[in-house]
């Protein structure tokens, strides 16, 4: 009986994927593509763009930060959606 209960618990955890975390791109500007697993509970990715003396800058990561005026922000909620 204990073995059956333990088996059911393990199968439930695998099926529900209780430890699921969102994966987002996190490379900056024109660097090679890299991804990171977001903290548990963080379900969105962002792509932030602006211009400065270096030219066009792109920042990517987990979450959906607040930005200052003049900065383009795109937030999304699917795997690797912020490229």
Curated annotation (Swiss-Prot):
<comment type="similarity">
    <text>Belongs to the three-finger toxin family. Short-chain subfamily. Type I alpha-neurotoxin sub-subfamily.</text>
</comment>
<keyword id="KW-0008">Acetylcholine receptor inhibiting toxin</keyword>
<dbReference type="InterPro" id="IPR045860">
    <property type="entry name" value="Snake_toxin-like_sf"/>
</dbReference>
<keyword id="KW-0964">Secreted</keyword>
<dbReference type="GO" id="GO:0030550">
    <property type="term" value="F:acetylcholine receptor inhibitor activity"/>
</dbReference>
<dbReference type="GO" id="GO:0099106">
    <property type="term" value="F:ion channel regulator activity"/>
</dbReference>
<feature type="disulfide bond">
    <location>
        <begin position="64"/>
        <end position="75"/>
    </location>
</feature>
<dbReference type="Pfam" id="PF21947">
    <property type="entry name" value="Toxin_cobra-type"/>
</dbReference>
<keyword id="KW-0732">Signal</keyword>
<feature type="disulfide bond">
    <location>
        <begin position="76"/>
        <end position="81"/>
    </location>
</feature>
<feature type="disulfide bond">
    <location>
        <begin position="24"/>
        <end position="45"/>
    </location>
</feature>
<keyword id="KW-1015">Disulfide bond</keyword>
<keyword id="KW-0528">Neurotoxin</keyword>
<dbReference type="GO" id="GO:0005576">
    <property type="term" value="C:extracellular region"/>
</dbReference>
<feature type="disulfide bond">
    <location>
        <begin position="38"/>
        <end position="62"/>
    </location>
</feature>
<dbReference type="InterPro" id="IPR018354">
    <property type="entry name" value="Snake_toxin_con_site"/>
</dbReference>
<dbReference type="GO" id="GO:0090729">
    <property type="term" value="F:toxin activity"/>
</dbReference>
<keyword id="KW-0800">Toxin</keyword>
<dbReference type="InterPro" id="IPR003571">
    <property type="entry name" value="Snake_3FTx"/>
</dbReference>
<keyword id="KW-0872">Ion channel impairing toxin</keyword>
<comment type="function">
    <text>Binds to muscle nicotinic acetylcholine receptor (nAChR) and inhibit acetylcholine from binding to the receptor, thereby impairing neuromuscular transmission.</text>
</comment>
<protein>
    <recommendedName>
        <fullName>Short neurotoxin NCA-02/NCA-05/UER-05</fullName>
    </recommendedName>
</protein>
<feature type="signal peptide">
    <location>
        <begin position="1"/>
        <end position="21"/>
    </location>
</feature>
<keyword id="KW-0629">Postsynaptic neurotoxin</keyword>
<dbReference type="InterPro" id="IPR054131">
    <property type="entry name" value="Toxin_cobra-type"/>
</dbReference>
């Amino acid at each position: 009986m204990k073995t059956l209960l333990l088996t059911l618990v393990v199968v439930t955890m695998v099926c529900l994927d209780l430890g699921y975390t969102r994966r987002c791109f996190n490379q900056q500007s024109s660097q090679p593509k890299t991804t990171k697993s977001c903290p548990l509970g963080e379900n969105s990715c962002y792509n932030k763009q602006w211009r400065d003396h270096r030219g066009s800058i792109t920042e990517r990561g987990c979450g959906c930060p607040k930005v200052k005026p003049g900065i383009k922000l795109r937030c999304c909620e699917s795997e690797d959606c912020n490229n």
